[in-house]
Amino acid sequence: MISQINNEERDYKLEAYDYFLDPSLIASKPSAIRHESRLMIVRNSVLEEDCLTNKFTKNLLDEFREGDLVVVNNTKVMKARLKVELENRTLVELLVLERSDECVWLCLAKPAKKLKINRKLKLKSPSEQDINLMVDGVDEETGGRFIKFPENITDLNSMNNLLDKYGEIPLPPYIKNSEEESFHENSYQTEYAINPGAVAAPTAGLHLSKSLISNLKKKGVIILPITLHVGYGTFKPIDQEDLTNLKLHKEWVSVNKEVVEEIKRIKKTDRRIIAIGTTSVRALESCYSHEINDFIPIAKYVDLVIKPGYKFRVVDGLLTNFHLPKSSLLLLVSAMIGRERLLDLYKKAIKEKFRFFSYGDAMYISPDSLLEKNRFKL
């Protein structure tokens, strides 16, 4: 059926964002040196060399210009995966997502069917005191469980303190290796992660080493942080075929006054704003206010959907990973350079054995490749 409709209509069909990936190209480990991961550089499609595949992320030093604003997401992945014990000593896994009410937190559970309402759980650790929990309800939207924690676990800080003692880093299920937990505690965090609250890493930032960041600053590149706590919705599969009225998850975003003022200055010049990761794109684009037609600081949950047809107001370029088929992240990148071109680039990446997903290689969408029709004229 999809083959019988035009390309613009196909942009709004989930099936049009599917592709085949050999499982051997799914990265289970990161590059040994962050800035040595491979980099595909995407340029304007009219250029003879519209795609470079022989680069590494350290070559971003040649791509970014003096005066460019590079925006990073400084969220930190919490040890949000907990193993709890039922009365019969059966183990169940929880993934803590967000606070629901007072000391009640929404968690995904595996296997969820064992967690009936009012069932008691015990959180155990070899070096810590046992903690009693209870199932308080069922969330119809996610299929998760509302779990009642001790009365003092009422905010993100107190929960993060508990998770630091009892939890583990929640790696995506496709990362299968025998590395120690301590390995992922470092490798699955960006070098600038300081604000705990995410349940998944903003993975494009994993490519930026301390030395690369230092060299970019020496060149005159401005690097500023935003915070977007990556939530469950980032990796939740899209469950509707028609994307016309797509609604996505909410995520907590903070963009401060310093970043907003820099955006306003840059938009009056020929300087550029480059986002490190799709989460930074979502945060930056969310700070535009339609009511006053201007950029404003924000600290709130946002549910912005970026898909083909979206007009970018803030972002000019993007460093990103290679994303899962049929994902909201694939829609976002397609909004920048077009779905067909993006899928052609993915075919090229697969042919040249680039590594995919969270620990994989990177793609840099240079500002000259962003389609003019997708830029909002301020």
UniProtKB/Swiss-Prot annotation:
One Pfam family, short name: Queuosine_synth
Provide the protein's localization. Answer: Cytoplasm
User: Which keywords label this protein?
Assistant: Cytoplasm, Queuosine biosynthesis, S-adenosyl-L-methionine, Transferase
User: Please, which domain of life does this record's source organism belong to?
Assistant: Bacteria
Q: Where are the transmembrane segments?
A: none
Which pathway does the UniProt entry assign to this protein? tRNA modification; tRNA-queuosine biosynthesis
GO terms (BP aspect): queuosine biosynthetic process; tRNA wobble guanine modification
The EC number(s) attached to this protein equal 2.4.99.17
Show the catalytic activity.
7-aminomethyl-7-carbaguanosine(34) in tRNA + S-adenosyl-L-methionine = epoxyqueuosine(34) in tRNA + adenine + L-methionine + 2 H(+)
Per the record, the similarity remark reads: Belongs to the QueA family.
Describe the protein's quaternary organization and the partners it interacts with.
Monomer.
Name of the molecule in the record: S-adenosylmethionine:tRNA ribosyltransferase-isomerase
Give the organism the record lists: Prochlorococcus marinus (strain MIT 9312)
